């Protein structure tokens, strides 16, 4: 928790904006996680304005790469994401958005977008025994 006060009232505070490492289209990945269970629900993308709206409205706003417009999860489905916290990773190229998810997070109707795709085959790694 920080005691720094930011002004995101009309645009993303320049001190926050300066910490972001955006892709070529000006976007940062946002990992959406249920705040109390830590379940990973989905990944979306935010530009500066989507992040500003997320930080100031209590609802998650994304930038739709396919529709080229802002969208708030739940405006049409009722499956709202209420913001509980937002963190920036150490490289500045990803956000962790903790939410209280109402209903399904995935457009398929599943709670998590990571249920439909399913697990991929892996060779499981093991930590060496301590000596």
Swiss-Prot record:
Signal peptide: none
Gene Ontology molecular function terms on file: magnesium ion binding; phosphoribosyl-AMP cyclohydrolase activity; zinc ion binding
InterPro entries reported for this sequence: PRA-CH, PRib_AMP_CycHydrolase_dom, PRib_AMP_CycHydrolase_sf
Keyword set includes Cytoplasm: yes
Gene Ontology cellular-component terms listed: cytoplasm
Requisite cofactors: Mg(2+); Zn(2+)
Binding site for Mg(2+): 89, 91, 93
UniProt-listed GO biological process terms: L-histidine biosynthetic process
Enzyme class: hydrolase
Cofactor note: Binds 1 Mg(2+) ion per subunit. Binds 1 zinc ion per subunit.
Pfam families in UniProt: PRA-CH
Enzyme Commission number(s): 3.5.4.19
Function summary: Catalyzes the hydrolysis of the adenine ring of phosphoribosyl-AMP.
The protein's name in its UniProt record: Phosphoribosyl-AMP cyclohydrolase
Species in which this protein is naturally found: Bifidobacterium longum (strain NCC 2705)
Gene: hisI
């Amino acid at each position: 928790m920080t005691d720094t006060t930011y002004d995101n009232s009309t645009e993303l505070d320049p001190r926050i904006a300066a910490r972001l490492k955006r892709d070529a289209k000006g976007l940062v990945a946002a990992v959406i996680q249920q705040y109390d269970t830590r379940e990973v629900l989905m990944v979306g993308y935010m530009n500066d304005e989507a992040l500003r709206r997320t930080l100031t409205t209590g609802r998650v706003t994304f930038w739709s790469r396919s529709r080229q417009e802002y969208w708030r999860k739940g405006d049409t489905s009722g499956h709202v994401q209420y913001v509980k916290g937002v963190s920036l990773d150490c490289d500045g190229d990803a956000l962790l958005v903790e939410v209280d998810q109402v209903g399904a997070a995935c457009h398929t109707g599943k709670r998590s977008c990571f249920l439909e795709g399913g697990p991929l085959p892996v060779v499981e790694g093991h930590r060496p025994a301590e000596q």
